Amino acid sequence: MNRKITFIRVCYWVCAIFELLAVIPMLSPKLFGVIMGIRDFNPGYDYRYAMGVAASFALGWVLLLFWAARKPAERKGVLLLTIVPVFTGNMLSGIYAVSSGLLKAATVFPSLVMQVLIIVAFGLGYFYAGKLEK
């Protein structure tokens, strides 16, 4: 199998697994509070509703990533859609959470690093997919 195709496929799978893991704290506010270092986090129904909607979209994205992994080069557009708006938006939200004082930088930093790595890998994957078409 072509190494570039394998690289792109691995990118999709790794991102899908990380995204799937992110859904768990979305559905458990208590776990979210523990992970994010927010003591006694007990949000209202409005938060729970919004996170339920967000979790539905996240699960849909997981399925989209698994689908794209089946034909990685042909579905390379999913790579760009994952970079912008998904991960760029997540990074901006994390930066906002730190700047507003909701979260500590040390709490958000590992997530930002992971997101930057995924953005770089997906950008490289998109480049590889373009080379495969020629």
Show the residue positions of the predicted features.
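Cytosolic juxtamembrane helix and N-cap/initiation of the first transmembrane helix
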Residues: 1-19
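Interfacial loop at the N-terminal end of multi-pass membrane proteins
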Residues: 2-5, 28-51
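Core segments of alpha-helical transmembrane spans in multipass integral membrane proteins
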Residues: 17-21, 25-26, 45-67, 81-88
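Membrane-helix exit/interface motif
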Residues: 32, 61-71, 91-99
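Non-cytosolic membrane-interface motifs at loop->transmembrane helix junctions
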Residues: 38-45, 102-114
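Hydrophobic alpha-helical membrane segments
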Residues: 79-95, 114-121
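Membrane-helix boundary connector in multi-pass membrane proteins
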Residues: 91-111, 127-128
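Membrane-water interface at the C-terminal end of transmembrane alpha helices
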Residues: 116-134
